[in-house]
Regions:
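Short strand-connecting beta-turns/loops that link adjacent beta-strands
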Residues: 15, 61, 72-73, 98-102
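Hydrophobic/aromatic beta-strand elements that line small-molecule binding cavities or substrate pockets
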Residues: 8-10, 63-69, 90-97, 109
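Hydrophobic ligand-binding cavity/cleft-lining segments
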Residues: 1-44, 160-171
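Beta-strand/loop substructures that line and gate deep hydrophobic ligand-binding cavities in soluble
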Residues: 82-132, 139, 148-149
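Intrinsic-disorder/low-complexity, polar/charged segments enriched in Ser/Thr/Lys/Arg/Asp/Glu/Gln
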Residues: 3-9, 53, 62, 75, ...
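Short coil/turn motifs at beta-sheet boundaries
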Residues: 1-3, 47-49, 58, 86-88, ...
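Residue-level detection of beta-strand scaffold positions
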Residues: 11, 22, 77-80, 107-109
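Glycine-rich portal/gate segments that line the openings of hydrophobic small-molecule binding cavities
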Residues: 31, 40-84, 135-171
Length: 171
């Protein structure tokens, strides 16, 4: 079957460690994705790290994803191991710092459909689902980050992060 790809890049006005913490917390991913997530098996040594399995209920589909590579604040690589209307599904999420208060997520998915001729539809649905989820993630992370006061080491005064517009780009 044909391999299809979905690639999205988003920029957020928060450090990459904030985005990583939110996207690596399997049990709470439902806040951003229109699906229910449950951590079925913990990874090692980190609970959400390599070997972690999460169950996803999305509409009529129930499937499991397993983390196969993980480096804190850098990347997460997972694959679907059971269920879903796709074969050979792999997801790569890379986190990059732009500066101290801005970062980028590069999200790349490859898959092949189980039913021939449905790849274009699945690609559209995955891209829409993922774009909506990343926009929700960025809005949440920026709201939380900007409402959290920080202390400067010299003046000992409190200030909020400056707001910079968020950009979303789909390839």
């Amino acid at each position: 079957m044909t391999i299809h790809t979905v690639t999205l890049e988003v920029t957020a006005n928060v450090p990459k460690k904030v985005l990583f913490a939110l996207l690596s917390d399997h049990a709470k991913l439902g806040r951003f994705f229109n699906a229910q997530y449950t951590l079925v098996r913990s990874g090692k040594p980190e609970e959400n790290g390599i070997g972690a399995i999460r169950e996803v209920i999305h509409g009529p589909f129930t499937y499991q994803e397993q983390v196969i590579d993980y480096k804190e604040n850098e990347h997460i690589h997972y694959q679907i191991i059971h269920g879903a209307p796709v074969n050979e599904h792999g997801g790569w999420i890379k986190f990059t710092s732009i500066n101290a208060t801005q970062s980028q997520i590069h999200y790349h998915i490859t898959f092949s459909p189980k039913i021939k001729g449905t790849g274009w539809l699945l690609k559209y649905q995955i891209q829409h689902f993922l774009k909506q989820a990343l926009n929700n993630l960025i809005q949440h992370s920026e709201d939380v980050w900007q409402s959290t006061p920080t202390v400067t080491p010299y003046s000992h005064t409190t200030h909020e992060q400056d707001a910079i517009s968020t950009k979303t780009r789909a390839k």
